[in-house]
Design a protein with these regions (language model features):
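Short, well-ordered alpha-helical segments in soluble proteins
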Residues: 44-54, 67-70, 74-77, 81-84, ...
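Short glycine/threonine-rich loop/turn motifs
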Residues: 101-103, 108-159
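Intrinsically disordered, compositionally biased charged tails
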Residues: 152-173
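Extended, charged alpha-helical interaction scaffolds
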Residues: 60-92, 96-113, 117
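Long, charge-dense
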Residues: 8, 12-66
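Short, ordered loop/turn segments at secondary-structure junctions
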Residues: 1-3, 18, 23-28, 95-97, ...
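Phosphate- and divalent-cation-binding pockets in alpha/beta enzyme and binding domains
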Residues: 4-8, 100
Length: 173
């Protein structure tokens, strides 16, 4: 993911409760889920270890190595840590840079929405959105629109089931 898009993607994905990858796409993140899930399990185990203070019996060097591993895994997999399996849709900012993610999604039949700049091939994504994938303001705009659409879709789905969003808000209060 482009450096200028990393924080924007994280904020908007968290705002609508969706999973995200805002660092380098790891090969096999979708197509080799078993291996990725093992890494996520390791991350959860390390997080629990450090939170509970179960650090007795480890040397300073071992603890330092585990902390470094935890930070690396958190950076790479933190946005998909609670994802149970394949996503229903993949949204990509730069279709040229994220070609591997698009290829994996296509292989699994997952629809892809992609921002296609003038240097990109719109044929590689299912729903191309023509636009600038470099400018921070443009990235912010696209991310906010997708986030708002997800929230609208969730609200419509909840309303369809007969639950009013206002009632849910009142129950939580």
């Amino acid at each position: 993911t482009k450096r200028q898009a990393q924080e924007i993607i994280k904020e908007n994905a968290e705002r609508c409760g969706q999973y995200y990858v805002n660092q380098r796409w790891l090969g096999g993140m979708l197509t080799n889920w078993k291996t990725v899930h093992k890494s996520i399990t390791r991350l959860v185990k390390l997080n629990e270890m450090f939170e509970k203070g179960e650090l007795a019996g480890y040397t300073k060097k071992e603890l330092q190595g585990m902390k470094k591993e935890q930070e690396k895994l958190q950076l790479e997999l933190g946005g998909i840590m609670n994802m149970g399996g394949q996503p229903d849709l993949v949204f990509v900012i730069d279709t040229c840079k994220e070609a591997l993610a698009i290829k994996e999604a296509k292989k699994l039949g997952i629809p892809v929405i992609g921002i296609c700049d003038t240097n990109a091939d719109p044929e590689c994504v299912d729903l191309p959105v023509p636009g600038n994938d470099d400018a921070i303001r443009a990235i912010q705009f696209y991310s906010e629109m997708i986030s708002a659409s997800v929230l609208d879709g969730m609200q419509a789905m909840i309303a369809e089931k007969g639950v009013k969003v206002e009632e849910m808000v009142e129950e939580k209060a």
